[in-house]
């Protein structure tokens, strides 16, 4: 079964990477329009959630952009961890977790470098840190679950 699961896992990972690339390729004006539309939807729906202290309602648009980074990189982290798990053999879980995290970090840094060349956009180290806040816990969660399953089986 794992033999056939690795191709869809890779396809999902590449699809998420493509979505990130397309969104990062948007000029500043279009990117701002999209995030403002999401912000207006959030404000209109009056979603009540438990949010961290740094989440300020006065600057909701900036926070929507930060959370978008976290969510999309969380998805990338999970899919990358699953893909690495399915494709690599004879490698420890720790090494796989480190590789999945490193690949996500490289993609996040590359994404910021790419944005440097997009009109009106800038490369920011803070965005890479925010991206890491998305993928690191998710990669860790995948490998903690795999570790726990292995411990229960033995």
Question: Where does each model-flagged region fall?
Answer:
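"…centered on the first transmembrane helix and the immediately adjacent amphipathic helix/loop
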Residues: 1-80
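Membrane-interface helix-boundary motifs at transmembrane edges
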Residues: 2-5, 87-94
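Alpha-helical transmembrane segments of integral membrane proteins
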Residues: 5-12, 95-103, 126, 130
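Small-polar-interrupted transmembrane alpha-helices in polytopic inner-membrane proteins
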Residues: 15-20, 96-116
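Membrane-interfacial alpha-helical segments at the cytosolic side of multi-pass membrane proteins
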Residues: 73-87, 133-149
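Interfacial helix-loop-helix junctions of multi-pass membrane proteins
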Residues: 108-132
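Short, charged juxtamembrane terminal tails flanking transmembrane helices
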Residues: 151-154
